[in-house]
Amino acid sequence: MGKSQNNTLNPFELIQKYGSDAVRYYFIKEIEFGVDGDFSETRFINVLNAELANDLGNLLNRTLKMAHKYFNGQIPKINGEEVEVTHPLKKIGISLGEEVTQAYASLGFTHACEAVLILVRTCNKYIDETAPWSLYKPVSYTHLTLPTIRS
């Protein structure tokens, strides 16, 4: 791809077709800063579908649905100190901020994106493995009536 081959990429057309956030994400994630990169519209679409729609979109959809269904749309308060250091999400969460900060400082935007995607994928895997919706037990009629009877 290049001017001499008369097949340059028009970023304005790409943005008009897919939106600036999608274009920005792809180039930050897939093409290392300061290095020539290779662009394919097919690859562009595949990356967006796999990482943003499937991985991130799926995580947001599942998490928000569970928050709405089980916690009245609120984020429950959790004491982070009560979560074991060996918990897979905590292990990543502890190091993620520093890792992304260092990646940004060294212009390693591709690495920063990949670090965040590891967290997203680990969250999805955790949800798949633990099936939290099956662990939730609504308050039974007995639990509601016992305090009343005791009074």
Please provide the spans of the model-predicted regions.
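Short, charged/polar, low-complexity loop and linker segments
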Residues: 37-41, 95-102
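Structured binding/interaction patches within domain cores
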Residues: 105-106
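Aromatic-residue-lined binding/catalytic grooves and analogous aromatic/hydrophobic interfacial grooves
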Residues: 109, 113, 123
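Conserved, charged catalytic cores of large soluble enzymes
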Residues: 60-100, 120-140
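Conserved small/polar residues in nucleotide/adenosyl-binding loops
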Residues: 142-148
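Catalytic adenosine-cofactor/nucleotide-binding cores of aminoacyl-tRNA synthetases and other
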Residues: 1-87
